[in-house]
Amino acid sequence: MSLATVDANYRSAVQRSTAFLETRMSDVGWLVWFNLLFFEMWVQNTFGFSYIDELAVLFLFFATVFKAVRMRKRAITIGSLEKRSLDLLFGVCIIGLAGNVISGVSVSPSNVAVDLFTCIKTPIAFICAYFIFYDNQRIESMVEVESKFLIVIMLVSAVMNLLFDFGMGWEGRYGLRSSFCFVLGHPTMVVAACAGLVVILARNRQDNFAWMSMAFVIIALTLRSKGFVFIATAAILLITYGRHEKFTFLHLLLIAVCGFYLGYDQFIYYFSTEGTARNELTKAAVRIANDFFPLGGGFATFGSAVTANVASYSPLYYQYGISNIWGLTPGQTMFLSDTFWPTVIGQFGWIGFAFYVGMIGSLFAFFYSRSSGAKLSVLLCFAYLFISSTSESAFFHPMSVFIAFSLGIAIAATRSAQVQNCEYEDK
């Protein structure tokens, strides 16, 4: 072990010890929010309360505003990339509202408001989490310790689930007794939760490699295709992503090949088989975007969670034959939110689709440019969201707020460490 490595490890240990000693009540509060977001599905299934992610976004937003007012320009400055992200997001909102007016599809104003907030909550959470955790090594130290504790508990439970039925299993696949859902209600929630933990741990991949590997085992035991693709993506990045932190076309090519190989069967089944929910939603979305060109149907008209209720069931589902598809019929809409891009295309049209893609690209560029030392966390975060967008509501999903929360913590801690390293060297 070189002297430089020993020195770096010593600095890291000193910083973490100091961080724990300097823990504030606000840090404990953010840790509570971290837990509420992680266990949101358990809270929803147990107590029927389903607004934790929305409340977390509002709390993040008002905390950011308060910090901006209190610190003025010393803590928060809006750069070109985040401004572009917000401008494009605002454009999507305008396009969606214009679509509601022009398309003439009958929807209630309250549903439009709910769907609009669903559209903006994750991008807002990303930006606010970045600014609110500015230079905060304390919260990251606390969250990293808890992340490792959660991984141990989940791994033991996942292995036991292979042998015994004790309420943490879902349907079996690939010859195994059952897939793992922990206390989160569905295996896909476990994949998202572990992805968030990996994003946090990835900023220090050398020290946390074993913990990340355990998280990948948990993801694998959910038996979900998106989980396998995410594991392959993470493995490629962990093996090939060097110290210079350069993401190249070769990385993208390797990830695309692995993703295609691992997800091909599921893609063919869901998107190329006539009569499946995802296939029919995709075809209907394209038709809607063409019929209502240049806009779409507007908010709360197609594919969004708010339209799953019988009272809010969209007239477009009858018009485009969606109401006759198993899993999409009135009162039986269990597969209605299993897509993301068809919802964007159907509700916002081709122009709105371009705006939304641009917004995501700007968000990624913003985080990647501001995350020296944590670029791997950024890549894993957006890779997971892109992978999940093929089979769930991705950026509209409640767990996406948890992912945004996790990335904000990972990046802010890295920046804090850089500042402290500079101070250490000056001494």
Where does each model-flagged region fall?
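Interfacial loop-to-transmembrane-helix boundary motif in multi-pass membrane proteins
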Residues: 26-29, 81-92, 119-120, 128-159
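Membrane-interfacial helix-loop-helix modules of multi-pass inner-membrane proteins that assemble, modify
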Residues: 101-108, 138-143, 151-186, 311-323
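N-terminal hydrophobic segments of proteins, predominantly signal-anchor/transmembrane helices
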Residues: 22-46, 57-118, 385
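Membrane helix-loop boundary segments at the extracytoplasmic
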Residues: 35-50, 339, 343-348, 376-416
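Hydrophobic transmembrane alpha-helices and their immediate junctions
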Residues: 24, 205-206, 245-247, 344-386, ...
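A juxtamembrane structural motif centered on a specific transmembrane helix
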Residues: 1-28, 68-75, 372-375, 406-427
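Alpha-helical transmembrane segments of multi-pass inner-membrane proteins
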Residues: 141-169, 182-241
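Long extracytoplasmic/lumenal interhelical loops at the membrane interface
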Residues: 269-276, 283, 298-348
